[in-house]
Amino acid sequence: MDRTLIQEILEVVEQAAIASAELTGLGQKDEADAAAVEAMRKRMGSIQMQGRIVIGEGERDEAPMLYIGEEVGSGSGPGVDFAVDPCEGTNLCANNQRGSMAVLAASDRGGLFNAPDFYMKKLAAPPAAKGKVDIRKSATENINILSSCLGMAVSELTIVVMDRARHKDLIAEIRSTGARVQPISDGDVQAAIACGFAGTGTHCLMGIGAAPEGVISAAAMRALGGHFQGQLVYDPAIAMTKEWADYTKEGNIARLNEMGITDGDKIYEADELASGENVVFAGSGITDGLLFNGVKFEKDCTRTSSLVISTLDSTARFTNTVHIKDGAKSISLS
């Protein structure tokens, strides 16, 4: 990968965000997702690369575009693997709530963990706590470590947790330490990455979310130098989700084995989930969020706010782009 490719990857998420944002607040989450998928795939198709989707919209028989294993790009150039979520937080987009974004991770061929469509226990924390907090430890232990690493009182810490029934005990434990809990309804990728930046008011992400999004978060946190660990969850009694109502622990273990994952309890570090020499994260806001604004439609232009983090040059670039419409007569500075 090179810097030219990184610029094109930025444009991929920008176009997906704009497409979804056209439907913000209309209650049409599936349509918003489909629009983002189509826009993302179209822009990817114009890039000089041998791209491959390793995490996408599902298996080939489940998704018409951006399915796992789909080849994208011109068919010549560098080999690049992608983990994509064209509209992360579809409910957030449909309801015009904060935190929806178009997002992807990219790496050299073979550089991203092909996460199954399972759940994942996650722990994200700032660079100062890297290697000190640990997903094996209790929430209380990690909060105390985080307090020490950041030089902050426990009462000043904010821990983000997905608002799910499975997290009832976790939330109670966090609050018992004196730390604050920020429950979120959807979209834990942005919350995880926000832990890597000071000043966001978010100091740690704990709890269980989707495994594919865990890979995208890991790519960003690896490039930032932050802490990220993930552990697959295969027990329906722990996941506590209606999607697994008919699944069994034994059946899920068998599914993992079929995918070549023989140790379902393995704890993955960020550099195992995103192991490539060159790793890039790109996200563009659909709605306003912790890291950037959502898409803004104006008479003569459309504005996007995005973030690209890359190990290639050790940068995190916040980008505000003005997409000028044909016949534009007046473009304001902001």
UniProtKB/Swiss-Prot annotation:
Keywords: Calvin cycle, Carbohydrate metabolism, Hydrolase, Manganese, Metal-binding. It catalyses: beta-D-fructose 1,6-bisphosphate + H2O = beta-D-fructose 6-phosphate + phosphate; D-sedoheptulose 1,7-bisphosphate + H2O = D-sedoheptulose 7-phosphate + phosphate. InterPro entries: FBPase_class-2/SBPase. Pfam families: FBPase_glpX. Transmembrane segments: none annotated. Signal peptide: none annotated. Its EC number is 3.1.3.11, 3.1.3.37. Mn(2+) 2 binds at D85, E88, E213. One of its GO terms (biological process) is fructose 1,6-bisphosphate metabolic process. GO terms for molecular function: fructose 1,6-bisphosphate 1-phosphatase activity; metal ion binding; sedoheptulose-bisphosphatase activity. Belongs to the FBPase class 2 family. Homotetramer. Catalyzes the hydrolysis of fructose 1,6-bisphosphate (Fru 1,6-P2) and sedoheptulose 1,7-bisphosphate (Sed 1,7-P2) to fructose 6-phosphate and sedoheptulose 7-phosphate, respectively. This is D-fructose 1,6-bisphosphatase class 2/sedoheptulose 1,7-bisphosphatase. It comes from Prochlorococcus marinus (strain SARG / CCMP1375 / SS120). The lineage of its organism: Bacteria, Bacillati, Cyanobacteriota, Cyanophyceae, Synechococcales.
